[in-house]
Amino acid sequence: MGHRLTKIYTRTGDTGDTGLGDGTRVSKDSQRVHALGEVDELNSTIGLLLAEELPAGVRAALACIQHELFDLGGEVCIPGHTSMSERQVSRLEALLDDYNRDLAPLKEFILPGGTRAASLAHLARTVCRRAERALVSLSRAEPVGTAARKYLNRLSDLLFVLGRVLNRAGGGSDVLWQRGKTIEKGKGGREK
């Protein structure tokens, strides 16, 4: 097993730099640290979703995904290290196909919302897209594994589908986008 922290604070980052997994020091605002932070925020957002009542299969999948995101973070934290594989990407694709099979085809865009769990899945999806963009930016400057980028792309798709699944499981439905909808006079204003 890797390095264990016996002390939470080290004071080594007080000057604005931090240590990567290979021991090199970089600025805390470097692209690599930024991408790592985005993946960490994604994992935390999925943890928030896991605090909700979820179907057992969704819970098991998300719990596994949290571990895989830690692996992905390890890959980002150690330049040149690869921990993500095409097998993990394929597994997400299989989950996507399985969950999407039972959903009605979409005729319109849907809004992020519905049940609390579905809304959190959509929030996780948007955080995942941000993490993916950060990883793509990093890959333009330094080598990044293609499986890691693909994984985040598929994960955001899965989180979208899970938002729909969770709305259905919670007795709700997709919130359909209504083109051109505006606030009507006398509705949606301040309550008196």
Question: Where are the language model's segments positioned?
Answer:
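Phosphate/pyrophosphate-binding loop motifs in nucleotide- or prenyl diphosphate-using proteins
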Residues: M1-K192
